[in-house]
């Protein structure tokens, strides 16, 4: 079997396509807009009692079935966090542009190559960009039905924001390719346009000056909230692509990262999946 990664694993969001993607001008303070659902004031978070996948787990997603001797196209992405529903289903969170409902999900590897033969560990059951009533959020939910040896590039506390007075001014992200990278917040939630291959969608996202690349999509974005490391978002896209052969450590860039807010995702999860355990 020959494998081929999709060429648009990680979405690029450029200032040419959307004014909201433009960085804050010199001398301006980051502006914290109200969250897309409601203005949430207290800082609150929760830690799922049962989490099948650790934040930062590598995932491979595809609508195709791998066959010996045939090309296999798949999306290389990362999980942000996971949780259990009241009906005992276990769910992982990633980016919507990583997969459509019905796509199968496999455990990813450290080198990014698809491990064959392998059994799927789950299936995408909701992807907001493909929903009839989209909420303009780059988020997908995966029902986990199997297990495997998972690759996780680092450790992040599985504490997820449910409400925030404002986002942390300094955030980090964990992705399967570039591991942990950190930087300063540029602005809070605003409408942006995501472009990935033939997919163009409006999306509500915050922005930070953080380096990332293909395969990191869907990973956790986190920062310190009241002295505690807390996941505040999910990696969505960047203003620039990391050139082949370059790394975040060796490349000086003005790259900016867009991320979907965890608070919005929590509201959406309850709406489309039901109550959590």
Language-model-detected regions and their locations in the chain:
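N-terminal activation segment of mature serine protease catalytic domains
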Residues: 32-84
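Active-site region of chymotrypsin-like
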Residues: 67-77, 149-155, 180-277
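Serine endopeptidase catalytic core focused on the charge-relay Asp
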Residues: 73-193, 223
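Hydrophobic alpha-helical membrane segments, chiefly transmembrane helices and signal peptide h-regions
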Residues: 12-19, 81, 136-141, 237
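Penicillin-recognizing serine hydrolase domain
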Residues: 36-48, 163-164, 186-200
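Polar/charged, compositionally biased leader and regulatory segments
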Residues: 28-48, 52, 107-110, 114-120, ...
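Secretory targeting and sorting signals
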Residues: 1-28
């Amino acid at each position: 079997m020959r494998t081929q990664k999709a060429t648009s694993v990680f979405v690029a969001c450029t200032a040419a396509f959307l004014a909201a993607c433009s960085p804050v001008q010199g001398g301006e303070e980051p502006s914290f807009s109200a969250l897309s659902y409601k203005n949430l004031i207290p800082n609150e978070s929760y830690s799922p009692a049962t989490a099948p996948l650790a934040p930062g787990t590598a995932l491979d997603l595809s609508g195709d079935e791998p066959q010996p001797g045939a090309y296999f196209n798949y999306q290389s992405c990362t999980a942000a966090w996971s949780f259990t529903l009241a009906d005992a289903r276990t769910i992982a969170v990633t980016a919507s542009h990583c997969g459509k409902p019905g796509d199968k999900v496999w455990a990813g590897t450290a080198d990014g190559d698809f491990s064959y033969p392998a059994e799927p560990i789950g299936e995408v059951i909701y992807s907001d960009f493909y929903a009839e009533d989209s909420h303009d959020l780059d988020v997908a939910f995966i029902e986990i039905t199997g297990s495997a040896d998972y690759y996780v590039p680092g450790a992040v506390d599985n504490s997820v924001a449910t409400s925030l007075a404002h986002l942390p001014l300094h955030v980090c992200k964990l992705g399967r390719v570039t591991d942990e990278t950190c930087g300063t917040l540029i602005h809070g939630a605003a409408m942006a346009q995501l472009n990935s291959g033939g997919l163009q969608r409006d999306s509500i996202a915050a922005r930070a000056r953080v380096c990332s690349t293909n395969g990191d999509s869907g990973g956790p974005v986190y920062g310190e909230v009241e002295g505690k490391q807390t996941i505040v978002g999910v990696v969505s896209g960047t203003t620039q692509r990391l050139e082949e052969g370059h790394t975040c450590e060796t490349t000086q860039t003005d790259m900016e990262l867009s991320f979907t807010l965890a608070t919005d995702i929590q509201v959406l999860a309850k709406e489309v999946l039901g109550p959590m355990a």
